[in-house]
Amino acid sequence: MSKSEDNITKQVKEMYLKYPYPSPSREISETNELVNLLKIFEIENKEKIEKLKILDAGSGSGHRIINVAKYLKNCSFTGIDISENSLLIANELKNKEKIENIQFLQKNILDNNTEIGKFDLILCMGVLHHLSDPNKGLQILSKMLNKNGMIFLYLYGKLGGHKRMLNKELISIILGKDKTDYETGIKIVRDIGLNKFDYGWNLKCESIEEENSLIVDSLLHANETLYDSITVNDLFKKSGLFGYAIFGISVGTNGLLFDVGSKNNEKLPIPQTNISKKLNSKSVLEKYEGKSIREKYRILELLYEPNGYTIIGFTKEGYEKLSNERIKRNFIKID
């Protein structure tokens, strides 16, 4: 048993034993959000991701990270997850796809995992917010970065996640005391028509099994913490990192690149936040331009109401080698 396997961790582990996510029947070609994100990062940073040692913290059933390992053939990958069942699926998928540059290990993010080494890039996408102690989780992961390292996080958004949380509460009340009765919970979700999903879960399900995994992950999860720009800043303040920047946000069923600037990169054919269109007033925009980065973050999230944030945390050396101008505009140094 893991040293940090508290009651919440045990519940999450049991949940994924019954309902691994993504579902084992899901094709990796249909879970390409993470590889697309890294491709965008490469385009904007004008540099290929090559020969890096990469950790995927919370691999689940491995679909997304195997897709990435397939793309970044010159990088070496380690995927960790607390669920033995999920890792069995991940290894089967790895063998099926003939991927040789990744290993999977059963580890708890909340444990001191120094024996697996340090990494140039850490991915923790949609996982930290499920930990019993996200602050501790980020602190531990930050210590596993090399001196010029970066960490990508995906965190649930409080503003855009409000309706989903109301739906979760509704289902929980109807379900009653036994919150681990996922079968009944799934039936309730279908019976009242709540089996529709936001960006991140918004996948076309080919089977009941796939949809069951989505329902459990989005509406019956044992534990989650939602964030806004204020609590994101609190999270990073305690991380030991040099600073961070919001890379992108999810809004409803769409993903947007995040930019505090008032002029977008029109050469990049990808949807982006656009403060000029949202405010649509020269005098108000002038006031906006005079605000701090954190105030701009808050204004943008109040206008867009994200249900999720993709965030990059940097070591000092990792930030100094960055050439991505949009991320530099968005960067917040931790005091």
Residue ranges and their predicted role:
Residues 83:
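Conserved SAM/SAH-binding beta-strand->alpha-helix loop
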Residues 206-335:
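Rossmann-like AdoMet/SAM-dependent catalytic core
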Residues 18, 28-50:
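Conserved alpha-helix/loop element of class I SAM-dependent methyltransferases that forms part
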Residues 135-147:
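A short glycine-rich, Lys/Arg-flanked "PGG" loop and its adjoining helix->strand segment in the class I
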Residues 113-121:
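A short acidic, Gly/Pro-enriched loop at the edge of an enzyme's catalytic core
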Residues 98-110:
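Conserved SAM-binding strand-loop segment of SAM-dependent methyltransferases
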Residues 152-195:
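Conserved class I S-adenosyl-L-methionine
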Residues 61-73:
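Conserved SAM-binding loop of SAM-dependent methyltransferases across substrates and taxa
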